[in-house]
Amino acid sequence: MHIVRIHQPGGPEALQLEQVAEPTPKSGEVRIKAMAIGVGRPDVLMRQGIYKWMPPLPATPGAELSGVIDQVGEGVGPERIGQRVLISSRDLPQRGGCYVQSIAVPHSKPYVLTDSISFQDAVSLPNLQLALALLQAANLNPNAEKRALLITGAAGGVAGMLSQLAKTHGFQTIGTARTPIKRDFALANGFDVVLDSNPESLYEDVMKATAGLGVNLAYDHLGGAYLPAYIRSLSSLGTAISYNVITGQPSVDVFSVMRELLSKSLGVRCFSMHTFDENESNRRQLMQQAIDSMASGKIRAPLPTVMSLNEVVQAHIILDKGETLGKIVLNPQ
């Protein structure tokens, strides 16, 4: 079978497509024939060798994979064969490992998929799981007025899921994106308003979009000049949640910005999905909630960019350039 490995961290060219023997499930394991593989930011960090949860080299990236159980190990019932499942490396002892055509994992780790969820859509479920956790982190008051929510990277997979969830809670959803193509994509995937992501004009643009009221919640994964602009765009008692700093740390003192706006009583929270690394019950409950939401049609996956496994280098070039629309999905077969 084919597998992607990193022997020496670097750019997209560090991803090597290699041929290895297909795994045989050990006692208590199942083998999954991959039908779709998700591509995301943690894969880039692993490729660069700077991922905090880096496995030993040679390493195989890939945080999620969907497919069919085609073989079981000793102690696992044969009725598992043929099950449509999703595996997330968040549930495995070691991160990554999903850029493969076949994988053997402990039998209790895969999530069973309903027939209504396609394999391509299934690898967006971890994005929905993260979106659910991000809303959970906001500690929403069910009785409070919900006006607007602001999200960076509106054309991305997590942002699209977060927007859909926020609308079910009664929020107007406002996204930001760098290019007209990305803004059109985000609008087509359910955002109410999508603004240019220029941090210099963001505050004024948000105020225009909200009749001068600002937003209750702001979700930022870019950092840099963006986070201070998002904080300024909050309404009184609003909260900004930072869940990554892709463009680096803010160059201005965020606390000084908050003190400047003291009369608004604003809050800032940092969030990481790794909060749930030692809380398997909550993590799996969030994923099951994500599966149920997608299976019912309440939440839908964004249109994916589908590429073959042997195009993995090109997929990472797209990621590095920030040209992703929705979710990049690799077809391994």
Annotate each language-model stretch with its function.
Residues S201-G212:
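Short amphipathic alpha-helix with an adjacent loop that forms part of the alpha/beta core around
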Residues C98-Y99, A177-F185, V252-V257:
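Short, glycine/polar-rich helix-capping loops at beta-to-alpha or helix-loop-helix junctions
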Residues L86, N216-Y219:
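N-terminal Rossmann-like NAD(P) cofactor-binding module of classical short-chain dehydrogenase/reductase
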Residues V123-E200:
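Mid-domain Rossmann-like dinucleotide-binding core that forms the NAD(H)/NADP(H) cofactor-binding site
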Residues A21-G38, I50-D91:
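Glycine-rich beta-strand-centered segment in the early N-terminal region that forms part
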